[in-house]
């Protein structure tokens, strides 16, 4: 079993954290928008937050995906193969959501001497620890042809298992700042996903928007396809991730585990839901 280190992450930087093991219902759009709602709360002085959540089936794309499609002309698609298409605020490229996919989000105040690498390590270390407990060694790396490819993919046995992205908003979250900001990092872990089906969905989207089919099914894998992973499911991975975090935090760090965001965050998520529509993102107004 691989042992992971925590000293090179941000987990000890703040004395209090919030762990959201989300159970409250919501639309696809509201669940996506809740990441930014958490950012608003953290920027205003709320505790840094780690969120574990699952969404209904859809494809979630980045603003970059929308812009690239606009360059070819035509309206951005709102669905592909019957799956809704929605837009997130962080970077990267398209990823599938659904009952076999674990979403994990990290929101911390924007502070001095915090870098992108630290943020990615902080986001992924709990998941990396869970995989290590199950005998799978995960590491960062690019995998050509994988979904949402980047240097901070989580890779097991040469295949991508999780994609990540980041978004930095506002200025430093310090007293007196007029534009207190936050850092949002997001991960998508394939727990029970058919790589062939997922690649078809992603390629159908990209064929409509950029005229290409860049995703290779064999570049990525799912936990249930790894040796010893046959019976794994998302609920198990959520529970194990929460337990890993609670065990890893020393006495100097308080981790508050909750099952829901605040009412204010839920309200902000509803307000921000319309901002996930591809055509609203493309044109700045609602379009049919």
From Swiss-Prot:
Task: Tell whether Transferase is among the UniProt keywords.
Answer: yes
Q: Where's the active site on this chain?
A: 148
EC number per UniProt:
2.3.1.204
One short Pfam name that applies is LplA-B_cat
Q: Which reaction does it catalyse?
A: N(6)-octanoyl-L-lysyl-[glycine-cleavage complex H protein] + L-lysyl-[lipoyl-carrier protein] = N(6)-octanoyl-L-lysyl-[lipoyl-carrier protein] + L-lysyl-[glycine-cleavage complex H protein]
- Is the Ribosomal protein keyword given for this protein? no
Give, as in the UniProt entry, the pathway in which the protein acts: Protein modification; protein lipoylation via endogenous pathway; protein N(6)-(lipoyl)lysine from octanoyl-[acyl-carrier-protein]
SUPFAM superfamilies associated with the record: Class II aaRS and biotin synthetases
BPL/LPL catalytic domain location, by residue? 44-253
Q: Which family does it belong to?
A: Belongs to the octanoyltransferase LipL family.
Q: What does this protein do?
A: Catalyzes the amidotransfer (transamidation) of the octanoyl moiety from octanoyl-GcvH to the lipoyl domain of the E2 subunit of lipoate-dependent enzymes.
Task: Tell me the protein's name.
Answer: Octanoyl-[GcvH]:protein N-octanoyltransferase
